[in-house]
């Protein structure tokens, strides 16, 4: 279970707390190995540790409606895309919906060159990308943190946009745009696959031309 937790959702270290008799090397009654329930990760024989990993269709369906009516959408993609192995799905989603995407430092270099791949946003990014976010009417955060490297001024960050945050775990939203963010607690790859399966081809030629002009 600890190994599963460390690799699923938002990967990271897991602290194992041992009972004091074991930690102090005292005698302890341990189950024989054949009585321990083993986890078969390859065959998905995994305890139900994270209910939030399952697709929450209601939240994704709300995002689909917003995508369908949006005229100036943009995606902010981060290292969670790489951790989920969802690079192909991100590109497929972007091509299907004609939505340009920016990549944070944790994803830069993992996505191929493409007209929809705008590169870095925020304090280390390109001015035109920040202009695109500022003038957007829909921002889709996926696999990226809501940090101050991109959200330089919360009051001026995409002031006229809906903001969706696709994040499989529930770390909370600890910044000044929390009241504007719609949380979608879904794995990046699964969410993109669901969106691809339930969206039709969309074009945003005028929006892309506007971004190019900047």
Regions found by a protein language model. Give the residues of each.
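Phosphate/pyrophosphate-binding active-site segments
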Residues: 41-46, 50-51, 58-61, 65, ...
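Short beta-strand segments
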Residues: 15-19, 76, 141-143, 167
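Glycine-rich beta-alpha junction loops
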Residues: 18-24, 79-81, 170
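Short internal beta-strands
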Residues: 17, 98-105, 164-167
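Anionic-ligand anchoring segments at beta-strand to alpha-helix junctions in alpha/beta enzyme folds, i.e.
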Residues: 55-56, 62-139
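Conformationally flexible catalytic loops at phosphate/diphosphate-handling active centers
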Residues: 5-69, 208
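Phosphate/diphosphate-binding loops
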Residues: 122-173
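Short acidic, glycine/serine/threonine-rich loops at helix termini
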Residues: 26-31, 85-89, 112-117, 150-154, ...
């Amino acid at each position: 279970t600890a190994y599963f937790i460390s690799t699923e959702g938002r990967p990271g270290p897991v602290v194992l707390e041992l009972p004091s008799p074991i930690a102090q090397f005292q005698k302890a009654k341990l189950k024989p190995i054949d009585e321990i329930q083993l986890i078969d990760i390859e065959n998905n024989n995994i305890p139900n540790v994270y209910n939030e990993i399952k697709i929450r269709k209601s939240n994704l369906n709300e995002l689909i409606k917003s995508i369908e009516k949006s005229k100036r959408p943009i995606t902010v993609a981060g290292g969670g895309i790489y951790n989920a192995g969802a690079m192909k799905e991100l590109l497929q989603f972007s091509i299907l919906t004609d939505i340009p995407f920016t990549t944070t430092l944790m994803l830069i270099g993992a996505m191929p060159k493409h007209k929809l791949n705008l590169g870095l946003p925020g304090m280390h990014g390109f001015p035109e990308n920040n202009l695109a976010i500022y003038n957007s009417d829909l921002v889709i955060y996926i696999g990226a943190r809501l940090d101050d490297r991109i959200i330089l001024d919360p009051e001026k960050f995409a002031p006229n946009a809906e903001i969706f945050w696709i994040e499989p775990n529930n770390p909370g939203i600890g910044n000044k745009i929390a009241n504007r963010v719609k949380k979608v607690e879904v794995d990046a790859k699964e969410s993109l696959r669901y969106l691809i399966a339930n969206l039709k081809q969309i074009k945003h030629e005028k929006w892309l031309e506007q971004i190019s002009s900047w």
